[in-house]
Amino acid sequence: MLDLKKKKKVFITGHTGFKGSWLCKLLANAGADVTGYSLNPPTSPSLFEIANIESDVKSVIGDIRDFDSLKKAFDEAQPEIVLHLAAQPIVRDSYKMPAYTYETNVMGTVNILECVRQSNCVKSFLNVTTDKV
């Protein structure tokens, strides 16, 4: 089991989604200091709500396309580890809203990478991507 006794600071984008919610729960239970940045949960009820993830992490509701809001949350968190899960993953939606999908999946990733580039605290970055880029 992952042991984060040193209270590693972790920043997760997409923390209100299915995978992000489970990851938050796992990392918080392992002792990490988790900050999540994401849109509101995509469904209701959602795993995020049912598992009461908000009680385990600092939850920031925001859009990764909004660099200034993302940067503010990122700077406040001062993470050592960044896990980027935020994406628009629905194929049908990508056909209906190609610009939104591009802005979220490509430019949102550019925004989080820019936050990492400008920071002095990040030691590790993981990009979990989708084939909808």
Which residues does each PLM region occupy?
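N-terminal Rossmann-like NAD(P)+-binding domain of SDR-like oxidoreductases, especially those catalyzing
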Residues: M1-V133
